[in-house]
């Protein structure tokens, strides 16, 4: 069902290097990052949902300059009975 592409990144779990992907999507034409889905497209879900959302939100706000919080939204989708975090990154504003 899910397959990585230039606009779709799959992550088994939250890892700090996800910020590189957020920046890359904002600097190009945007994309989505699904956290809780492995590289083969298998839905695993997120175990520490609230903790991971808070870490992710804080990392995007505090670590990326200029601020891109207006271009990145964090959502939770229920897929195959599992909670998955979706980071929807829009194309950033040109400088």
Where are the predicted features?
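Conserved N-terminal catalytic/coupling substructures associated with nucleotide/phosphate chemistry
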Residues: 1-95
């Amino acid at each position: 069902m899910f397959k990585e592409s230039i606009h779709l990144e799959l992550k088994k779990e939250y890892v700090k290097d996800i910020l590189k992907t957020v920046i890359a999507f904002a600097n190009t034409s945007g994309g989505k990052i699904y956290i809780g889905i492995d590289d083969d497209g298998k839905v695993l879900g997120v175990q520490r949902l609230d903790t991971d959302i808070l870490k992710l939100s804080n990392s995007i706000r505090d670590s990326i300059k200029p601020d891109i919080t207006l271009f990145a939204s964090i959502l939770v989708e229920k897929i195959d009975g599992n909670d998955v975090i979706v980071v929807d990154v829009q194309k950033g504003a040109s400088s």
